[in-house]
Swiss-Prot record:
InterPro entries: a/bCoV_VIROPORIN_3A-like_CD, a/bCoV_VIROPORIN_3A-like_TM, Coronavirus_Orf3a/b. Belongs to the coronaviruses NS3b protein family. This is Non-structural protein 3b. Residues 41-131 form the CoV 3a-like viroporin TM domain. It is found in: Host membrane. The chain crosses the membrane at residues 47-67, 75-95, 102-122. The lineage of its organism: Viruses, Riboviria, Orthornavirae, Pisuviricota, Pisoniviricetes. Residues 135-214 form the CoV 3a-like viroporin CD domain. Keywords: Host membrane, Membrane, Transmembrane, Transmembrane helix. The keyword Transmembrane applies. One of its GO terms (cellular component) is membrane. It is a multi-pass membrane protein.
Length: 244
């Protein structure tokens, strides 16, 4: 779509697919048939050549309409490019005679925008269009894309420290993690609370949000835990002094 991606498509075939008229008055019937046959072969060859390029253009527009990112600045840039494509690039292609390219570009992007605008209207949050997704999680007013887990179960894990956690590109500070809650809105609707805070060996935490309480956390890296415990015992043994 940029830099001539749409210059070789089926719309060019439509412009080129005009009957070849021989203005000479004294043309035999056999020659006219040969001209028609040659014209048919030329148009068929052009159509076969432009089908793959048209398919690539359609796939590119579809990819652009569905592409999403978790980075805020990237999402802003992509959204601005989509708006320019719908309002400027699509009509420009139509004005220059590339009707199929312009119609496909404008229609696909507009339909995607209208679909996301429904969630924007229902939830009164523009982030559905910004992040190009139908489901968002809100942590104390801050929006971030929600990634579905396996088996369509709804839970969220956030990485952080003893008094903070990372929400996408933002850092949320808190006093008590039990006061932090997550609201899932869009295609899924759920309210999650902190059910477990897992402390890592380096001092960081992984906060687990779920609708169901967590019974326990299994330490799969038991060898690392055993080695760490041995190191602590050796340090304590080195600090033991004989006072007798």
């Amino acid at each position: 779509m940029i830099g001539g991606l749409f210059l070789n498509t089926l719309s060019f075939v439509i412009v080129s697919n005009h009957p070849i008229v021989n203005n000479t008055a004294n043309v035999h019937h056999i020659q006219q048939e040969r001209v028609i046959v040659q014209q048919h072969h030329v148009v068929s060859a052009r159509t076969q050549n432009y089908y793959p390029e048209f398919s690539i253009a359609v796939l590119f527009v579809s990819f652009l309409a569905l592409y999403r990112s978790t980075n805020f600045k990237t999402c802003v840039g992509i959204l601005m490019f989509k708006i320019l494509s719908m309002t400027l690039l699509g009509p420009m292609l139509i004005a220059y005679g590339y009707y199929i390219d312009g119609i496909v570009t404008t229609t696909v992007l507009s339909l995607r925008f209208a679909y996301l605008a429904y969630f924007w209207y229902v939830n009164s949050r523009f982030e559905f269009i910004l992040y190009n997704t139908t489901t968002l999680m809100f942590v104390h007013g801050r929006a971030a894309p929600f990634k579905r887990s396996s088996h369509s179960s709804i839970y969220v894990t956030l990485y952080g420290g003893i008094n903070y956690m990372f929400v996408n590109d933002l850092t949320l500070h808190f006093v008590d993690p039990m006061l932090v809650s997550i609201a899932i809105r869009g295609l899924a609707h759920a309210d999650l609370t902190v059910v477990r805070a897992v402390e890592l060996l380096n001092g960081d935490f992984i906060y687990v949000f779920s609708q169901e309480p967590v019974v326990g956390v299994y330490n799969a890296a038991f060898s690392q835990a055993v080695l760490n415990e041995i190191d602590l015992k050796e340090e304590e043994g080195d600090r033991t002094y004989d006072v007798s």
